[in-house]
Swiss-Prot record:
Keyword Calcium: no
Region (Disordered): 59-83, 203-228
InterPro entries: MRP-S31
Source taxonomy: Eukaryota, Metazoa, Chordata, Craniata, Vertebrata
Transit peptide: 1-56
Protein name (Swiss-Prot/TrEMBL): Small ribosomal subunit protein mS31
Primary localization class, coarse: mitochondrion
Gene Ontology molecular-function annotations: protein domain specific binding; structural constituent of ribosome
Bias (Polar residues): 66-76, 207-217
Pfam families according to UniProt: MRP-S31 (PF15433)
Origin: domain of life: Eukaryota
Keyword Ribonucleoprotein carried by entry: yes
Family to which the UniProt record says this protein belongs: Belongs to the mitochondrion-specific ribosomal protein mS31 family.
């Protein structure tokens, strides 16, 4: 039910704030804002009625209104007190916390994008490999029988056993390293990658027909005919240097008596110049046979008929000279540890295809000279090399 407002009562201006039914603070704020705008303070008891959605009427008796400046100051003070209380609560919580130190290993996380440089990785890998692998022994490539025979020879001799054993094993190790180096060189020589890299793609020459205009051919023919007509007949005759009278400037008998000088072998520079000249004047292959001939010269194909010993620089030595080396052991004793040691040495040399006969004989000669130097000491201990 709505009450009528008499006409003599002056209506109050609408504050523009949303009002809710039964809210005391809103009604007070509605009454304070117009007064704050004008700067006056109302002290009379007034009854404020507002419309609401419900049937009840909101009313408030204001005994005394408060200025707007005081309300804003109170609100700011209340906010400041709230912040201070929050800070105090946080400080209390932090004080109550206990810090526990952990002695576990700290793992530093590396950024995902960054990677160590390549040279650092290779250096670290080599260091780890060097630390992980045990050091190589000098006699790791030698057979245990050969090492045992060398130690037996050293035990049988009267002088320092360790020095004698080390000298013998050192010579054997040197021989083994030479043979291994030659095997690596041989493998490197027959590598498939080297064959492919040296191969050249042969292109068939394109048949080009030189077409000249007709007037140019006629012009050339005319020029040739005019020159041939002008040349005399004597000029066109062929002259031979070995016909006619001799001038007798040189003595023919002196040159005949001189023996022909032996032809010297071409030097390295001449051979290299001939190779360069051949490559410059080289023409594409006409067929497959020419290509196979060239590959045979370069060592990419076997010679035909097939020769298994092709490319071996062995000074023409026979096969049996590589295998049967017992004839070089005549100066050594017939029995005993020295004989056993030398038999093992010759057995290893006969199975080595990478050493020439001269190198094998030199290897045996080294041991002969070594024992001959110790001949006086061996005689004192009743050990004879030729027994």
């Amino acid at each position: 039910m709505l009450h009528r407002i008499p006409a003599f009562i002056r209506p109050r201006p609408f504050s523009g704030l949303p009002l809710s039914c039964g809210n005391r603070e809103v009604s007070v704020a509605a009454s304070v804002l117009p007064a704050a705008g004008s700067g006056a303070v109302r002290t009379e008891n007034t009854i404020q009625r507002h419309f609401c959605t419900s049937r009840s009427i909101c009313s408030k008796k204001d005994d005394q209104s408060v200025p707007a400046n005081e309300t804003s100051q109170k609100a700011a003070e209340s906010q400041g007190e709230g912040k201070e209380t929050l800070k105090k609560n946080l400080l209390d919580v932090i004080k109550d916390m206990k810090v526990q130190l952990n002695t576990a290993n700290v793992k530093t996380t590396k950024p995902r994008g960054r990677q160590p440089p390549a040279h650092l990785e290779t250096a670290v890998g080599r260091l780890q490999k060097a630390l992980g692998e045990p050091p190589r022994k000098r006699n790791e490539f030698l057979s245990p029988e050969l090492v045992a025979a060398a130690s037996a020879v050293a035990d049988s001799l009267p002088f320092d056993k360790q020095t004698t054993k080390s000298e013998l094993l050192k010579q054997l190790q040197q021989h083994e390293e030479e043979s291994r180096a030659q095997t690596d060189r041989q493998k490197r020589r027959v590598s498939f990658t080297q064959i492919i890299s040296n191969m050249k793609i042969a292109k068939s020459p394109s048949m080009r027909v030189s077409s000249r205009p007709q007037h140019q051919i006629q012009f050339d023919e005319e020029v040739d005919s005019s020159l041939s007509q002008e040349k005399p007949a004597d000029f066109r005759r062929r002259k031979c240097l070995f016909k006619g009278k001799r001038l007798s400037i040189f003595d023919v008998k002196a040159f005949d008596d001189e023996a022909p000088e032996p032809e010297a072998a071409p030097s390295l520079w001449e051979i290299e110049f001939a190779k360069q000249l051949a490559t410059v004047s080289e023409q594409p292959f006409g067929n497959g046979f020419e290509e196979m001939i060239q590959w045979t010269k370069e060592g990419k194909l076997w010679e035909f008929p097939v020769n298994n010993e092709a490319g071996l620089d062995d000074d023409g030595s026979e096969f049996h000279e590589h295998i049967f080396l017992e004839k070089h052991l005549e100066d050594f004793p017939k029995q005993g540890p020295i004989r056993l040691f030398m038999e093992l040495v010759t057995c290893g040399l006969s199975k080595n295809p990478y050493l020439s006969v001269r190198q094998k004989v030199e290897h045996i000669e080294w041991f002969r000279n070594y024992f001959n130097e110790k001949r006086d000491i061996l005689k004192e201990n009743n050990i004879h090399l030729t027994s």
